[in-house]
């Protein structure tokens, strides 16, 4: 189309950089922030749903875990079918954002205790395969000796987007529907804006999926250790992201005392946004340092600190900030 740009048109002839690189990177990051608000849109309002509709604990847990399960299924399906190479990245992102926005928005027309919501959360998670991994492919097309920084920017955008529903909940008052609806609207905006993104000159196709890759991921020791470390990190991180809001709500409810339910809810939402959102700075600075200090060293230090925090926070229940 008229918005396409060939590789020769985006290479800076001076060799100093890639013309149009940073506007495109920031546009992509913005789209990720807007679209990834869908991930925890329903999780952010679990305390309100439990209070107003007696939502069972097991069903509340599925609000978050269904998204993760959908993401795994969606990512594997995309990899096996090679969707990221068969479908132009911008179009893939747009379609995924639109479908996820619709699935998320349909929550508003269902009873909060309906099991159909779990399926909609699963579908939302599956669509994330067209947003986050595809976004990584898009940002890599602009990498030139600064892969760590670019990946850090994108992970930071993911983090900020994941934190945003907790901020929506605060600005929307006590109505949980506001956070759900706003997340869908922002995802649609992301799907429209992504069409203005121009891929960099290093864009390339991924090799076709082969089942042997699964075995290689285990038999190659460095890759196996990296995957196991990432698995443990994700187990901790997404458990924290999913439940820190519920934990803080219960903690502040106890510490503030009876009759302070609204204050506890707003305070929990604000602190949860800050707790998750501060990861944006961690991702940015981590990306900068990774290219200088080494990814393995930085990752080990970050995971050690994160693990210590995870152990310590349980002993602080019922305390204030």
Residue ranges of model-derived segments:
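Extracytoplasmic gate region of multi-pass secondary transporters
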Residues: 42-44, 222-280
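Hydrophobic core of transmembrane alpha-helices in multi-pass small-molecule transporters
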Residues: 103, 115-130, 320-321
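Conserved MFS/SLC helix-loop-helix module at the cytosolic interface between two early adjacent transmembrane helices
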Residues: 75-113, 290
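Central cavity-lining transmembrane alpha-helices of secondary-active solute carriers
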Residues: 65-81, 273-285
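Structural signature of the two symmetry-related core transmembrane helices
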Residues: 91-105, 297-312
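Cytoplasmic helix-loop-helix junction between adjacent transmembrane helices
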Residues: 120-156
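Helix-loop-helix hairpin linking two adjacent transmembrane segments in secondary transporters
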Residues: 145, 153-198
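Juxtamembrane intracellular "pre-TM" segments in multi-pass secondary transporters
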Residues: 10-18, 198-228
């Amino acid at each position: 189309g008229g918005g396409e740009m060939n590789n020769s048109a985006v290479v800076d002839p001076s060799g100093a950089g890639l013309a149009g690189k940073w506007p495109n990177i920031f546009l992509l990051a913005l789209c990720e922030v807007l679209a990834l608000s869908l991930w925890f849109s329903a999780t952010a309002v679990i305390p309100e749903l439990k209070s107003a509709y007696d939502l069972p604990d097991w069903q509340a847990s599925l609000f978050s875990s269904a998204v993760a399960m959908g993401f795994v299924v969606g990512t594997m399906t995309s990899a096996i079918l090679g969707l990221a190479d068969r479908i132009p990245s911008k179009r893939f992102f747009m379609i995924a954002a639109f479908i996820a926005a619709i699935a998320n928005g349909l929550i508003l027309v269902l009873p909060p205790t309906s099991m159909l919501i779990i399926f909609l959360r699963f579908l939302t998670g599956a669509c994330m395969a067209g947003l986050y991994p595809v976004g990584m492919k898009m940002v890599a097309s602009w990498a030139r000796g600064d892969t760590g920084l670019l990946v850090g920017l994108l992970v930071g955008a993911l983090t900020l987007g994941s934190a945003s529903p907790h901020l929506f909940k605060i600005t929307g008052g006590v109505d949980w529907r506001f956070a759900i609806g706003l997340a869908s609207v922002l995802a649609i905006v992301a799907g429209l804006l992504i069409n203005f993104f121009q891929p960099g000159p290093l864009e390339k196709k991924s090799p076709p999926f082969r089942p042997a890759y699964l075995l290689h991921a285990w038999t190659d020791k460095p890759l196996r250790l990296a995957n196991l470390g990432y698995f443990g990190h994700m187990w901790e991180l997404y458990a924290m992201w999913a439940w820190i809001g519920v934990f803080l709500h219960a903690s502040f409810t106890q510490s503030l005392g009876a009759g302070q339910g609204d204050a506890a809810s707003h305070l929990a939402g604000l602190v949860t946004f800050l707790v998750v959102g501060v990861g944006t700075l961690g991702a940015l600075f981590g990306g900068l340092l990774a290219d200088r200090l080494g990814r393995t060293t930085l990752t080990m230090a970050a995971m050690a600190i994160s693990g210590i925090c995870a152990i310590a926070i349980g002993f602080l229940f019922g305390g204030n900030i």
